[in-house]
Amino acid sequence: MHQIRAIEGDQLLQIALRAAGVDHGRISSWAMEPLTHRVENLTTASLDHVHGVLDDGSTWSVIAKTLQPASASPMFASIPVEHHAQVLEDLRWLNEPDVYRSELGPELPAPLRMPAVHHIEDSGSDRITIWMEDVGDVTPWDEDRYWRTAEALGALGGRWSGGDPRRRFGLRPRDIARLYFGKITHLDLPLQAADEFWDTPEIAAVVDSEHRRDLLQLASDIPRLLAWLDVVPRGLCHGDATPDNFREPAVGDVVALDWSYAH
């Protein structure tokens, strides 16, 4: 369902011009369709593909991501009331626009970058729409791409390891120990302890016989690793580095999306 509120024609034109990479023009036509991407988090109200044609024939295309407080999601009602405050603290819906407004983007180590943000529409109420670059994805997730992405994320982690990047860029701290001893311990690990989970055809088709063993071994090591993290310098991480949050419009151009968990 579209969540984009009315936008002034002049503002849409400015977005279109930035997306097309031109200074002047008029919009001849435009359209908007919901992305087929499934939204599974509480703070994303909608994802829309907005595109059109300028009067000189130039085409433009952007993604409009509309954010909301977690409490505005229909899924919030399924969370026990006693956990509401904690969920709202963990899922801060203003994090992502704050990151895009910060100076982090220009200082990311190459080849990592954010999508270009053309406009952030903030009416001061309970919806914010980020109008951003429609980033293509042309390379397969083969071993080379996993290496490139991992190296880019490693460079990010080491870029500011001697200071406090969270303070520098206005990022809010995130307690990863609480994430592990919360959702992972009480939901993910019990789910993956069942044979039925691993027998699911979609899962069985993509993991080998050692994957389950390795994952459970890693889970048992995490408390020790978390204790070690408490005494070493902290860098900066993306916080949600799943393949779905990365695009490669060209080989080696690593674009990270969804910076709401950066810390």
Residues of each region from the PLM?
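Conserved NTP-binding catalytic cores of kinases and kinase-like/nucleotidyltransferase enzymes
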Residues: 1-125, 249-254
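Active-site acidic catalytic loop and adjacent metal/ATP-binding pocket
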Residues: 46-57, 63, 223-263
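Residues immediately flanking
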Residues: 66, 134, 259
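Short, solvent-exposed loop/turn segments at secondary-structure junctions
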Residues: 69, 122-124, 136-138, 242, ...
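Short alpha-helix boundary/capping segments
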Residues: 88, 92, 141-148, 263
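Short, hydrophobic/amphipathic alpha-helical packing segments
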Residues: 97-101, 150-157
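A conserved loop-to-beta-strand element in the N-lobe of protein kinase catalytic cores
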Residues: 125-132
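ATP-dependent phospho-/nucleotidyl transfer catalytic cores
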Residues: 134-147, 155, 162-238
